[in-house]
Amino acid sequence: MEKDNQPSIEELKAFLQKNNIEYKNIDLFIEATTHKTYSKVNKNSKDYERLEFLGDSLVGFLISDYCVREFSSLEPGELSRLRSKLVDKLALFKIAQKLKVEQIIKTGPKKARNEVLSSSNVLSDVVEALIAAIYLDQGMQSAKDFIKSHFYEIANKAQNKPNKDPKSELQEYFQTISAETVKYETIEIPNKRSFESKAWHLNKIYGTGVGLSKKDAEKNAAANALSKLKT
C-alpha cells in the first residue's frame, strides 16, 4: 500500500497478473478501480463510473451470449431466469469477493475508505468497470474469456439449484459481510386480518412485506430487501 493506504500501481499490476488479466494501457485499469471519493480530492484522476456504465451493458450482453452457447438445452424462459441470476448485484458481488477487488480500489480518506470497501454495490460496480476495461484494452474475446472463467461456477450452481427461500437467500447475503443475523419485526394488522413485517440488519430496515400469515409477511419482507439489494 502507498503511504495513505491506497493501493499502488505495482499492487494493481500484481492483481491483474494473478487473475490472468493482460493489459496494454494500465490507466484504464487504474480508472476502473478508482472510487469517486478519491477522484474528488485528486483532480487529475478519473473514477470508475463511466466504465461501470459500459460494463453494465457488456455484462448483460456477454452473459446472454454465454448462456445461449453453454446451455443449449434450455428454453428461452429458462435462459432468461438463468441470466437474471447472473447479472444481478449478488452474483457480481460473489465475483468481487473471489477476486478480492477491495484490495485494489482507490478511495477517499480513512472513514470514506471503510464505508466504500464495505459496500457490496461498490465492489460489484468495480467488477463491471474491470470488464469494460478488459474490453476496451484487449477486445471482446478477452472480455468473453473473463466472463466464462468467473461466471461458469455460478452459472452451473444457479442452473442446478432450485430457487431459495427469500429469507435464506437474504441471510446468506449478509453472512458474507457480517456475523449479525437478519431480524424480523412483525405485527398483526387486526382490521385487515394480515401481518406486516420489516427485515432488519445492523439497525437498518432493508425491506418490508405484508402477508396473510406471519411467515408470508417475513418472506415478502426478505424478497423486498433482496430486490433492493440487487438493483
From Swiss-Prot:
The lineage of its organism: Bacteria, Bacillati, Mycoplasmatota, Mycoplasmoidales, Metamycoplasmataceae. It comes from the Bacteria. GO terms for molecular function: double-stranded RNA binding; metal ion binding; ribonuclease III activity; rRNA binding. The active site is at residues 56, 128. HAMAP family: RNase_III. It is an enzyme of class 3 (hydrolase). This is Ribonuclease 3. The keyword rRNA processing applies.
